[in-house]
Amino acid sequence: IAKELKFGESINYKDFALISKADLLSLMVGEFPELQGVMGAIYASEDAQFKNIATAIEDHYKPKFSGDSLPRDSFGDYAALAEKFETLIGLFSINEYPTGDKDPFSLRRNAIGIIRIIIEKDIALNFSGLIDKHMPKDNKDAGSILKAFIYERLSNYLKDKNFTSNEVDAVIS
């Protein structure tokens, strides 16, 4: 997914993937889960090799809630998109969907985060093609279900931005 999103040549996305979750093992994050990412950024900024990805480590969880800020730079944008797509594709591929008001894996939040980053940061991304390429072939329905799930969130996002139902339907179809 990182290659599809074109992380950029100046930052090694493999280094990012290797250390972006290292703070989850720390006692600090274990005791204060809200510091997830924040502590990772602090740890990374202490190592000259990883200083250039410290901000992205903190930002790749964003947005964490409705109205939260978006990542501060393009690498953070791409890292957040990769994180959210990986979560959605992984869970939908094993038929883990939100039901009713239950969403234990925050899949709705991840989908809305993808939509906000793509639209508000003006990122050109064919998420339908990305899903087709990375969804396991043994679960053909999961890709269609995931696309419908994201389109439903996109529809609601656009309506919240005062687009009419006709305008939204024209864009989504």
Give each language-model segment a name:
Residues 1-173:
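Amphipathic alpha-helical "coupling" segments that flank catalytic cores
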